[in-house]
Structure formats: C-alpha cells, structure tokens
Amino acid sequence: MTADPPPARRVLLLASCFADAGPAIRLAVTLAARTRAPLEGVLALDPRAEAAEGAELVTGRRAAGATLVVSRERLSLAYAADARAFRSRLDRAATALALRTSFRIDSGALPDLALGLRQPGDAVIMGYRRFLPLRGPVIALEDGENGPAAQLATELARALGLRARVLPANTPPEALDPLPVGALVLSQAIHVDAVRLAALIDAARCPVLLAPDG
C-alpha cells in the first residue's frame, strides 16, 4: 500500500552561506508550492565566529578539507552579503509562485538548528552544494518504496525533472559518498541525531530534506 507524503505545515530552508542556499531554493519552493506552505529561510551563523572577540581569527573547514582563516570583521561582512543575497533570491522565487516567505538569521551548526527549529508538520531543508545545480537523482532513505519519504522523493523528482531512487533507511553515510545525489530525503520515522545528520550531509554533498511527519 502506498503512503501519501504528508503536507508540510511550514518549509524551512537552512544554509550557512548563500552559495549553499542557492541550489536548494528551487527544491524548497517546489516543496512549498505542493501545499502552499509558508517558506522560511534561515542563514545559520557559525557559532565560533560569534564567540570570537575583536579581530581574533576564526578557523573552519570546507567540504574539500582546506582550512580557512579569516578575521571576525571580514566574516561579518561576508555573512551580511550572504544574508542579502539569500533573502533576495528566496523572495523572488517565492513571489513568482505567490508563496508566503520570511527570512531570519540564527546561530548554530546546520544539524543542530534543523533538529532544534523543526516543529511537528515542518519540512526542513539543509542547503549544501556549492555552486552546483541539482542534477543527480532525488534519493530517499526509507525501508520500502511506498513510504511517505519515498513518495515525496518521487514527487519532487518529477517536478524537478530528475530521477528518484530509494535506499534502505540504515544506509551508512559512506555509501552515499560516491553517488551523484541531487537531494536526499529522510523520513522522520528514522531516528536521526545531529551526529548522523552531519555525516549524511557531508557524505551526500547535496541538499538534505527532513520530510514532514504525518
């Protein structure tokens, strides 16, 4: 028996920079348009940057493993520019489909914010794929092809002109690493903690969607 994907009460799009948010906006707008759900963009500030004082340097790592060292002032300017670009692109995309939208800035790592901000009925997307459009299949991690996450992945793939694929719920993050994943859909029936979520994001290198619960 096929389980229809539940409608989203609200669609949250989280990203730590505009480059990661950009490719995920199309996915977020497509999901929100499904049920006319309000769309909320959240720029996630690195908590290490906020903890730095004065001109103290902040270090971090990108997906490629290179270490970044920037001043707090320069990082603040970059976040301000990202916030403007993120909000502008989100507003334009939402306005084109007459969707309600809002934007805010919060602090924290993406997995922690996703699990902390999510409320019952919310769909949460974590944007992660630098500069690249969505091209690979939309993959659902779910046991069986008729569950709500699998059905949602199929609907989104069809709307985006992509393929859909279902992998077992217990698929380890390292199995996603070689796959050209366009987006990853996770059922909320799967227990996803912040550590596993971070590992899945890093391995898939694509937008990750926590599907709304029923």
Task: Tell where the protein language model's regions lie, with residue ranges.
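Short beta-strand segments
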Residues: 43, 127, 187
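Structural beta-alpha unit
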Residues: 1-4, 74-124, 162-208, 213-214
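Flexible loop residues that form catalytic
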Residues: 47, 129, 189
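Small/aliphatic-rich secondary-structure junction motif
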Residues: 2-69, 135-184, 199-203, 207-214
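Charged linear interaction tracts used for macromolecular binding and regulation
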Residues: 96-100, 120-123, 127-139, 143-145
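Short, basic, helix/turn surface patches
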Residues: 66-74, 130-131
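Short beta->alpha connector loops
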Residues: 17-19, 107-110, 131, 145-146, ...
